[in-house]
Amino acid sequence: MLETDVIVVGAGPAGSMSAIQLRNYGLTVLVLEEHSAIGKPLHCSGLVTPRTLESAGMDHSLVLNEIKGAEIFVGDVKPLVLGNEVTRALVIDRVAFDKYLANQAVLKGAQLNLGHRVTHIENTPSGTTIVHANQKTFSSRILFGCDGWRSKVSTHLGNTKKDLIWCFGGEGIVSNHPKDMVRVYLDAEIAPNWFGWTIPLDNKRVRIGIGTTFGSPERKPIHLFNKLLKQYPTHFEGLTITSLSGGFIPLYTPQVIESRNSLLIGDAASHAKPTSGGGIYTALEGAKTAAHTAYQALSSIQAGPVQLNSYHSAWSKTLGKELVRGSELRKVFMDLQSNNQLPTLINTLSIKPLKKMVHNYGDIDYPSALVNPILRVASAMIGPALQLSKMSRASLPLKRFVSQLASQK
């Protein structure tokens, strides 16, 4: 049995970028992907920032549409319209995106085995990891878990609890949707603890989705999806649905993401952003950190067990800190939504100085960057920050968040 430096389980963005980076360091890499085709089944909305394409080392050839802003709806209040002429996000061909990264990994020299579902993992006293897949046995000195929210590697590390968002959606054709604007729906009755969305692919095609926390049968996303269509009929006039899909988003929660010789990256590590559910950018950046950690470990110990205990601290100093802040922001959002305070927030953010702050500082990848500017403007406009009318109950988690934000600076 030939031993590989690193076995990567999963050939999504996390796995393929890991393989690319590991090969850049001259390490031997085997990628095991359970599906027979890269990028399928599709479970992602495909909305990313330009920063994500840069991180992937990719040009705009896979971009289907450019997004300049958002329309945010909740209840009967006037929608909050954000955006200008600046491109804020990109709609990508997600299947082609995954294929591109996987092909780059193969071109770099990684071995890719499709249709290989990992069934068992074991560690040996010598420091080697044995991986069983498709009645075959593989061995490596280091194991990367990039195998999504149901990660076999994560289970091997002892993780059992995840904060899952249950999603349902698809693609369709509508009569009228702004080509350069996404729509976000915050109503608690159609997306409890999360939100709904429409993302235009072009002048007529849209991606539609809804999400909620895993819970009671009446919260099944397919039922909430139908509620969304009924509650906003003018938005879905002439809708013809062309495809449907569902899945889960593992929002950031503290997990064991490293062991002596195993690392978790991307959704396997529950590294999806708590505010938006996006996980591609965090997966790409996590893969780079993980690959560097593996290279350093293998360079320092030529034989025998390795130690990967620097990965968590390195990750925590970069995007890890933002994910912690994002978790606090999500608590604020859920409190506002459950207390029916989101309409008040939408009205407040429509005030010109606050809206300007959102335009200037809003960032899908780093949402916490918006908090302090908003609070400064709010404080100057209406007295002490957080004393927004009708929001006293909902202000407490925001106070906790600001306190934590200040302590981490």
Residue ranges: model-predicted function:
Residues T49-Y100:
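A conserved beta-strand/loop capping segment in the N-terminal third of enzymes
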Residues A11, Q104-E237:
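Predominantly flavin-linked oxidoreductase catalytic cores and closely associated redox partners
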Residues H35-A56:
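Conserved N-terminal glycine-rich FAD pyrophosphate-binding loop of Rossmann-like flavoproteins
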Residues H120, S216-S299, P305-V306:
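FAD/FMN-dependent oxidoreductases across multiple families
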Residues G15-S16:
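N-terminal Rossmann-fold NAD(P) dinucleotide-binding loop
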Residues Y295-K409:
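C-terminal helical "tail/cap" subdomain of flavin- and related membrane-associated enzymes
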Residues M1-G12:
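Beta1/beta-strand and adjacent pyrophosphate-binding region of the FAD-binding site
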Residues I20-L42:
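Glycine-rich FAD pyrophosphate-binding loop
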